[in-house]
Curated annotation (Swiss-Prot):
UniProt xrefs under InterPro entries: CheD-like_sf, Chemorcpt_Glu_NH3ase_CheD, Cytotoxic_necrot_fac-like_cat
Catalytic activity reported: L-glutaminyl-[protein] + H2O = L-glutamyl-[protein] + NH4(+)
Cystine connections: none
Protein name: Probable chemoreceptor glutamine deamidase CheD
Role description: Probably deamidates glutamine residues to glutamate on methyl-accepting chemotaxis receptors (MCPs), playing an important role in chemotaxis.
Organism of this sequence: Ralstonia nicotianae (strain ATCC BAA-1114 / GMI1000)
SUPFAM superfamilies tied to this protein: CNF1/YfiH-like putative cysteine hydrolases (SSF64438)
Length: 233
């Protein structure tokens, strides 16, 4: 288990937890939408904490003392928090596989841009400040069967780093690429992150979910992509 930092912060009165999917806007990504009413809450006995699973194509932003948990193969996840207020969130996404330009304006790159911007926007809505953000990124492994030659994981990892660089947002820590799936545990209220490397055969169900997500992305990216969202602070 790899641990990425821990820092206690004062707690203040905050808005309610925000939950939604990062499955794009109407049209292009409609088939990816997860029900906003569905929840993935559970009690994690290993860490004795209330926890919330974040599945492929989703994000979760919270002001509560929750642990956010996801399993990553080729997908990437940004764990972002306001280090003064303890507001934080996590996303889980990948770029659609396309034989196209790597321009930030290409359809697949716009998908990744949206996945990052919707998380940041929801954090700002909850009260987070850009200048107080602490960002750690994970995933991008070469694990999806039949997709290794496309360097899907590497492409995802490079995208998230380039997006943050272009936005002027520093990366506090990262654990990207390699060939092993990862299980990521993130506690926004403290900043503590634990990463467990998994054996591929031991996480078949999670990777199957990611493979289905990749297939849906490939089919839906043909629709007209949404325009870039505007960030606000």
């Amino acid at each position: 288990m790899i641990e990425f930092g821990k820092k206690a912060v004062p707690r203040a009165a905050m808005p309610d937890t925000v939950r939604s999917d990062s499955g794009m806007t109407a049209g292009a990504m409609a088939t990816l939408a997860q029900s906003a009413a569905s929840t993935h809450a559970y009690y994690d006995t290993t860490f004795s904490r209330r926890a919330m699973k974040v599945l492929p194509g989703e994000y979760y932003v919270t002001t509560e003392d929750l642990m956010l948990v996801t399993v990553l193969g080729s997908c990437v996840s940004a764990c972002v928090r306001d280090k003064l207020l303890g507001i934080g969130g996590m996303n889980h996404f990948m770029l659609p596989s396309r034989n196209e330009s790597e321009s930030i304006l290409s359809p697949s790159m716009r998908y990744g841009t949206h996945a990052m911007e919707v998380l940041l926007n929801q954090l700002y809505r909850a009260g987070a400040r850009r200048e107080h953000l602490e960002i750690k990124v994970f995933g991008g492994a070469a694990v999806l069967a039949g997709m290794s030659t496309l360097d899907v994981g590497e492409r995802n990892g490079k995208f998230v780093l380039e997006f943050l660089r272009s936005e002027g947002l520093p990366v506090a820590a990262k654990d990207l690429f390699d060939v092993h799936p990862r299980k990521v545990y993130f506690v926004p209220s403290t900043g503590q992150i634990m990463v467990r490397k998994l054996r591929s055969q031991g996480s078949a169900a999670e990777l199957d979910s990611e493979a289905q997500y990749a297939s849906k992305l490939s089919r839906s990216i043909a629709d007209k992509p949404a325009s870039r969202l505007q960030l606000f602070t």
